[in-house]
Structure formats: C-alpha cells, structure tokens
Amino acid sequence: MAGPVRVNAHITGTVWKIEVKEGDEVAEGQVCVILESMKMEMPVEAPSAGRVEKVHVAEGQAVSEGDVLVTLA
C-alpha cells in the first residue's frame, strides 16, 4: 500500500455501529462502519485491505458526506 487509505462517509448521517478497532486487519470490501440515515442502515466498506490505524468517530456521532471515519495503514 502506498500510504494511508481513508474510509470516508458516503452519506450524511449518524454512526450507528463501528465494526473495527485500531490494530485490526481488514480485507477489501469488509464493513468498517455502519451509518444510519433516514432510518436506513448503510455499510461503509474498506476500499482496500490494510490495518486499522485510527478510528476517527464514535457511535452516535453525526457525520457529513466525505468525513473520514477510519484510516487504514
């Protein structure tokens, strides 16, 4: 991997559940965070495999489209 990979929110909503923790190894396509918007749950997947370097959000936190949720190393 060339550098850190950001997992961004693709919608504005609320962090419903965080599926990973710092230090976890994730696969491409693995769900990292589940967002809730308009009573719908929307999974946010890792764009590539890597190790979770930082989780930038907490459950219940409001996020906007484009916000960084997780950074992979």
Protein language model annotation of sequence segments:
Residues 50, 55-69:
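PDZ-domain C-terminal substructure recognizer with occasional recognition of PDZ-binding tails
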Residues 1-14, 34-47:
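Short beta-strand-turn/beta-hairpin segments enriched in glycine/proline and small hydrophobics
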Residues 12, 23, 31, 49, ...:
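ATP/adenylate-binding site constellation spanning eukaryotic-like Ser/Thr protein kinases
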Residues 8-10, 19, 33, 56, ...:
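Conserved beta-strand segments that form the floor/walls of ligand-binding pockets within enzyme
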Residues 16-21, 25, 54-57:
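Short histidine-centered loop motifs in beta-beta connectors
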Residues 27-43, 64-73:
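Short hydrophobic beta/alpha edge segments that flank linear recognition/processing sites
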Residues 23, 40, 60:
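Surface-exposed, flexible loop/turn segments at secondary-structure boundaries
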